[in-house]
Amino acid sequence: MGYRAKGRRQPKADSVVAPPKRVSIKGLDYKDLASLKRFLSDRGKIRARRVTGASIQQQRQIAKAIKNAREMGVIPFKSGVSR
């Protein structure tokens, strides 16, 4: 364990923030497997907003379409290693 001086914290170095990614989800449908696969991990989980670059509203639409596709049997609930 190192010694930590009490008092003020060191200011963080200025970091360059990347601009948000643009995600096009126009016409996203639960039947379009190719477009839904972009938002699923290899294990079948829905990817986070910070990974996909989607806005809050877009992420809700993506999640709704994926969950609908799971219910309809277009994509499995789980994928990857099975027990």
From Swiss-Prot:
The keyword Metal-binding does not apply. InterPro entries: Ribosomal_bS18, Ribosomal_bS18_CS, Ribosomal_bS18_sf. Pfam families: Ribosomal_S18. The keyword rRNA-binding applies. One of its GO terms (biological process) is translation. Belongs to the bacterial ribosomal protein bS18 family. Part of the 30S ribosomal subunit. Forms a tight heterodimer with protein bS6. Binds as a heterodimer with protein bS6 to the central domain of the 16S rRNA, where it helps stabilize the platform of the 30S subunit. This is Small ribosomal subunit protein bS18. It comes from Tropheryma whipplei (strain Twist).
